[in-house]
Structures are given as C-alpha cells and as structure tokens.
Amino acid sequence: MDVAAFLLALVPIIWLVVMLLCFKWPAWKAAIGSFVLSCVLAFAWWHLPAAQIATASLEGFLMALWPIVLVIIAAVFTYNLCVRTGAMDVIGSMITSISSDRRLLALLVAWCFGGFMEGMAGFGTAVAIPAGMLAGLGFEAVPAVLICLLANGVPTPYGSIGIPTVSVADLVGLDSLHLATVQLVQLAPFFVAMPLLIVLVAGRVADDQGNVASVAERLHGVAGVALLSGVSFVGAALVVAMFVGPELAVVVGSIVSLALTAALAMRAEKSGRLDARFHMNIEAGEQLTVKSALSAWSCFILIFVLLLGTSNLVPVVHAALAPFASHVQVYCGENPGTLTFSWINTPGVWIFLAAFIGGAIQGASPRLIGEVLAATVKQMMPTVITMLSVLGCAKVMGYAGMISSISAFCIAVAGGLYPILAPWIGAVGAFVTGSGTSSGMLFGLIQSQAASALGVSDYWMVALNALGVAAGKMISPQTLAIGLAAVHVRGKDAELLGAVLPYAAGMLVLMSVIAMLGQGLPL
C-alpha cells in the first residue's frame, strides 16, 4: 500500500474540489488546472514519457469531442431553437393545462416534463425550465426548486441523450446497453419513490387555520398516480435501455410516464375527490390545434424517430451505416485503447438533423437557425473546455497508473466493504462538478479497477458511480444556483441546500445498502 502515490494521485481531484468549492472558480478553469497537474505528476512521479502524456491527452480530447461535445451542443441547440420559435411555451402550456391540483402539476411539470428535458438536453435545463414553470403557476420559489431538484437526480445518468452512460462505458470499455440496464436496476427503487416524495413536498401547504396537511392528506387521491408515474417511467426506460441503449431510455420513460400521469390526472380531476386545499387558480391558455401541437413537438419527435430508426432495433439501417466509421489508436505507450468514430450513426448528427428540420417546421428561417447555433456554441464553450480537460486528465491518470494507485489504496483500506463507498464517490463527483458525465470521467476507471481487484462485476461497480450521481447532482452548488436563478431568487442557497440535503443523505444510505446486497445478482 503506497500512501505517497495515493495522496499524489488524488492531487488533481483535490485541486478540482478546492478550486470549485472554496475559491469559486468556474469549472473550466479548475478542470484545466487538474489536467495540468495530472500531466506534471505523471511525468515527475510516475515517469510517463512526454510523448505518452501528449498522446494520452490527445486520446482524451478526441473522445470528448466526438461524440460527447457533439451531443451536448446538438441537444442544447435543439432546446435553444425551440425557445426562440416559441415551441417550448406551447409545450409548457399543454402540460400545465391538464390539472389544477398542485401535487399533480408538480408530477407533470417537474417529474415527467423535467425528465424529458433531462433526457433531451440536460445541463441545467431540466431544473431551470420546470422550476420557472412551477413558480409561474404560483408555487413558492424555494419549494418549486426543491421539487425540481428531487425530480432531476435519478434521470441524470441518461441526460443529454445518454451521454453520461455512453461516455463512461467507452472510457472503461463496457457495453453501454448492459451498463445502462444495470444502472436502471439499481436506480429502480428511487424512480418509484421519487414521485411520492414530490407529491409530499408539493402538498405541504397550510389551511386557513395554519394547519399543515398531514402525510396521509397529501397522498390522498394522488398516491396511486404518483406510484404509477414512477413505475411507468422506470419500466419503459428499462425496456429501452435493454434493447436500444441509454440514449433514449429516459426520453421514452418520461414520455410514457407523462402520457399515463396525464390520463390519471384528468381522471382524478373529474372524480371530484381531490382535496380543495391543493387547488391552484390557473388561467386557461389559448386553444391549441393538433397542427400547432405537432409543430411544437416536431424537433423532439424527429429526434426520437431518427435515433430509434438507426438503432439496433432496425438492423438493416444500423448495418448499412456501420461502415461509416474510423477506428484509431492514439496512445503511443503500452496497451493503447481504440477510439471508434461513427461519422453518421451517432446521436449528435441525428439531433442536429432533427433540429434543422424541426426548426424549419416551426417557422425558423435559416438565418435564425444559424444565429441560435452560433449562440449555442458560444454558450457551451466553457462546458466544452471542461469536458476536454476532464477527459484528458482521466486518460493521463489512467495510463500513468494514478488511477491504479487510488483504487489499490481504497481496496486495501476498505476491502470487501468498498462497494458501500462506491455510490458516495460518484456523489462527490456530481456534487463538485454538477455533472454526471464529469463524475463518470473522474471516477469510472477507479470503480472499474476496484471491481477487478475485488472480483465483482465491472458493470455493477461502475453503475454504482451513476447511482451516487443521482444523489450528488441534487445538492451540487451549480445545480442549486441554476434553480434559484430560474425563479429569480438570490441568497437562498443555504436554505435550499438545507431542504434537499436530508433527501440526498437518505438516498446515499439506501444506495450503500443496495451496493452491498445486490453485488451478487446475476446481472
């Protein structure tokens, strides 16, 4: 057990934590510092030649650019374009017109629509947009953000068309379909429980005498809706993950959940059994035609059709596009990895195509589309730099042996109890960076090597990192700031953190139990 090597290997990670949390540096600056430190340490302590450091870095940069950065920019561009064309306003109006019960509205907006936004775009949109919608409907600001934080955690490993799962699978050499499936098995209890928690938070209101509704009163009339909302979400997502992959798991899951929740909500409204204290006065929006509704959803419908039509479910198309790919080895040292660049059949390409066509359907001119694309690239440049730096750092640390030093020390100290710590490690990554993708890039290799040392499934251990991300994301300072900014509130970060922290801590305890009890499952 080399304590010195362990401590030195942690320096790039500690740097990132300290710079982000203590000195409030932007993520891209802190990530560059971590990358530079990893290169210096790899050369000075692990004696990795300069050429190998350079090629390891280049491998990380290329992996970040294609497909991760491509998908990120494409997804956010699609969202930005829908905002500029007014499509997002139409979609929001459609969802909020379904019910006037605050508990059901929270499910529809934060859980179903928020899950859809996470699957399609991610990067804060799934907290900011639903939180703003809830506040606009009359929810108090901090509870509105709290509801969206609770809703946003569990779908995060499949955000931005599955990028967190796809990227960590590529990094550690695992099959993305199998990894996505194992992750969903681990996350399933939280998918089912979270809508119930959302209902409890949304229903925490007082009557005219100041008496707060009890737990039973808050659940009355909507508990079944919440339960089925969660079950339908994870059930549909699991099927998609098993047969299509992580890219559409949360997208399809959220759509199925939205359709079922909307139907059940309308039925509950008509029953007349909903408690009047949870009623909200909502102004009726303009009557929408089928044409305007389809136009508003066109970008997302096209993304769904294109990704599904080019997946393994359509072997003829999938096989025809497979040759349009390049396989290269960049690292010049021992045991280099192989990078695969799919030039056509990659989610980013299809998302861009869907956005261009959908934007035209929504009435966007080529000039407007170009303006939105340019603005999106500029908007996402800090994220691009962060991804390049984090992937470069991860590759240098991996090839130099720094990851091995960290995992060897953790195994020596924790032994067979290491799986208990695995979700907490993933949570720390998400808490610090505010990103499920970055957490996987930082700690995915550590989890994989720990699995090999313990003789347990790589898939189970790497999936535990994503499990922890679900809890860490909801307490990340970046996520809190995005949510509060969306409801135009300042100085409430501590109050919001205090409200969400017990939920995250409770989740992590349950995650550790799942980590230990489930490692023997035949997955």
Can you annotate each of these PLM segments?
Residues 103-115, 140-154, 175-195, 199, ...:
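Alpha-helical transmembrane segments of multi-pass membrane proteins
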Residues 54-137, 146, 363-450:
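Membrane-embedded alpha-helical segments and adjacent helix-loop junctions characteristic
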Residues 253, 280-426:
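Transmembrane helical segments that form the transport core of multi-pass membrane transport proteins
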Residues 1-5, 24-30, 54-66, 178-185, ...:
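Interfacial loop-to-helix junctions that mark the boundaries of transmembrane helices
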Residues 25, 84-87, 100-101, 134-144, ...:
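Juxtamembrane helix-boundary/capping and inter-helix hinge elements in multi-pass membrane proteins
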Residues 4-6, 16-52, 74-85, 261-272, ...:
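Structural signal for alpha-helical transmembrane segments and their membrane-water exit/capping regions
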